[in-house]
Amino acid sequence: MISEARKPRPIKRHAAPALAAMLLIAAQGLHAAPPSGDVEFMNKAAQAGQMEIEASNLAQNKAGSGAVKRFAGQMLQDHRAAAADLKRLASAKGVQLPTTPSQDDKKKLEALGALNGASFDKQYASEVGVKAHNEAVALFRKASAEARDTDVREFARKTLPTLEHHLEMAKTMASEVSR
């Protein structure tokens, strides 16, 4: 007969694995992906930012205007910083971001890369400066108001004023290069 002290205790035997499972589930909950609309915003923001970085890299070599080169330099600095912030946010939320521009933006970059000097300047100012920033401002405004994840919403709110400033800078640059 088994003594009382040596009897197996089913509750203790199952408690450790059950506790481990509960902790694992709780930890996964801390890193749960944001709602699908917020993830879609993050993906679009990553792709748009990557397009602006790649286009601005092109501008450093192909632009003829000093204004375009200065604008592109500012875009590289600001969009790299925003991309790093977005990457940290995505990592914390367990979201895998795209690392390349969208297919449409890749086509625009290819067309832009075929240009030089004044023709490059006009196209860059129009497509990357004004049009892309109009789209980015709209995207970030919507996320600032509608994102359900508070961290995603805060990222959009924090980044929006910079994008609005870029849009104003782009309009000025576009008027300079269209003269």
Where are the regions a protein language model picked out?
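His/Met- and acidic-residue-enriched segments that coordinate or traffic transition-metal cofactors
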Residues: I2-A18, M22-R179
